[in-house]
Every structure is written in structure tokens, then in C-alpha cells.
Regions:
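Short acidic-glycine-tyrosine-enriched beta hairpin
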Residues: 43-57
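Basic/polar phosphate-binding segments, predominantly the helix-turn-helix DNA-binding elements
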Residues: 152-158, 176, 180-226
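All-alpha amphipathic helical-bundle segments outside canonical DNA-binding/catalytic cores
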Residues: 114-118, 131-148, 168
Length: 233
């Protein structure tokens, strides 16, 4: 991040290279506006619909896979520092709550009803405008808008966790392997060992893992270990 606190960008791409599996040490709010995208976050893979919101916590491995054949890829991406969110949280309101994967019913994906979806979209569009504005008070207006947005997302996440069921595109084998890697990253892991443990042909497992996660098992394990090592520093 180039500026302290947060950064927000509105993108529209007709051409875009492959985005590799990656992570970062800040929070990300991603609003999908248009295009054809599958997005993997840790052990889940989502086919996005316009208006979908992704909440990505620090150090969560994630990767979009984009098809640009018919429509440009449009989205708004907001990055927020952990210290910034802590600064504006209170004993009664923890603004990082919606990102906490340990909360029962937690979801990275918010697929909202039309009215709250439009409200969140309007807040993000306004935040883009205020952030890029030189008008009087735009610095304060942008912070106020950001806090409003985070409060609204936490409210929607709390409601969504009670009734929204995720569509997980990955097959049960890949999901189970991802969960196993996440739980046993510190142990010896190899394609042969995982294929044997889950009673599946190793070539089939390798192909399906690459197809659905967008990277090899070896590279995923390395990335996961790097994430954990950074968290322990």
C-alpha cells in the first residue's frame, strides 16, 4: 500500500494477464461489477455474480481466474490496514469482525439482496470519489464513508452467516486436500502422499487441483508455509 490507512481502486480491464496465487498483510474488500470470474480463497472456489462482495483477511491465499472473451472485467478493490481498522473500532464494535474466519458461519462471500447490495455499491463508489477529490473536507468525508461501509458490511455478514449457503465449485477431493494442507502444512506433504491418503490417482488429483485452485499442490504448500512463517515473525 502506498498511502497510510487505506487505498481504493476502480478497475475496468479488457486485457489482463494471469494473476498468481498471492496474499498480503492487510484487509481486502472486493466488489465484483462485471465480467466472468472464478475466485479462490483458501479452500473455497466461487463463481462470482455482479454485485458479489468478497471479504479477504490478511494472509489468506487468494487468486482470481478471469475470462475476458465477452465482457470487460470490472471491479472495485479496497485495501485497509489492520491498524486503521483497530483505530476506529470500539469495545462494542469491532470492524474486523466480518473478516474473522474463526467466527461460526463465517463467509468470504456476501451475495446480498438488491437493496443492501445497491447501498454497499453506492458507498464504495462514493469512497472512490471522495478519495480522489480535492474538495474541502474530502479527507474527513472519505473516512466517514469508509466507516459507514465497514459497519454495513459487518451487519450484512452477521445476517448472511445465518442463512446464506456458499456455492463451492471445487469437488470434494480438492476441498478435502486443501483443508488437509491447511491443517498439516508443517508436515511432509507431497502429491504421492496426498493421492494415497485420499485414494485418488495422483495425475487426476494434480490436474483437478491445478484446474480448480489455479496452481500446483507444491506451490500451494510453499505459499501456505510462507504465510504462516510471516504470521509468526
Amino acid at each position: 500500500m502506498l498511502r497510510p490507512g487505506y487505498e481504493i481502486f476502480r478497475y475496468c480491464d479488457s486485457e489482463l494477464g494471469e494473476v498468481s496465487l498471492h496474499h498480503h498483510d492487510f484487509y481486502e474488500i472486493y466488489l465484483f461489477l462485471n465480467g466472468s470470474v472464478e475466485y479462490s480463497i483458501e479452500s473455497r472456489i466461487y463463481r462470482l455474480l455482479p454485485g458479489d462482495i468478497l471479504l479477504i483477511g490478511p494472509m489468506e491465499l487468494h487468486q482470481p481466474r478471469i475470462t475476458l472473451e465477452k465482457h470487460p472485467y470490472e471491479r472495485i478493490v479496497l485495501w485497509v490496514n489492520k491498524s486503521f481498522l483497530e483505530q476506529f473500532s470500539t469495545p462494542h464494535t469491532t470492524l474486523t469482525h466480518c473478516f474473522d474466519s474463526t467466527v461460526p458461519g463465517h463467509t468470504n462471500l456476501l451475495r446480498l439482496a438488491p437493496t443492501p447490495r445497491q447501498h454497499v455499491t453506492d458507498l464504495m463508489e462514493r469512497l472512490v470519489a471522495e478519495t480522489n477529490s480535492a474538495d474541502y473536507g474530502s479527507d474527513l468525508a472519505s473516512i466517514g464513508c469508509l466507516i459507514q461501509l465497514l459497519v454495513e458490511l459487518n451487519r450484512q455478514a452477521a445476517n448472511s452467516a445465518q442463512h446464506h449457503e456458499l456455492t463451492d465449485k471445487s469437488g470434494p477431493i480438492v476441498t478435502n486436500v486443501l483443508n488437509y494442507i491447511n491443517d498439516h502444512y508443517h508436515e511432509e506433504l507431497s502429491l504421492d502422499m496426498l493421492a494415497s491418503r485420499f485414494f485418488v490417482n495422483k495425475y487426476h488429483l494434480s490436474h483437478e487441483f491445478n484446474r480448480l485452485v489455479g496452481t500446483s499442490i507444491y506451490r500451494y504448500v510453499i505459499q501456505k508455509r510462507l504465510v504462516i512463517a510471516k504470521q509468526m515473525l
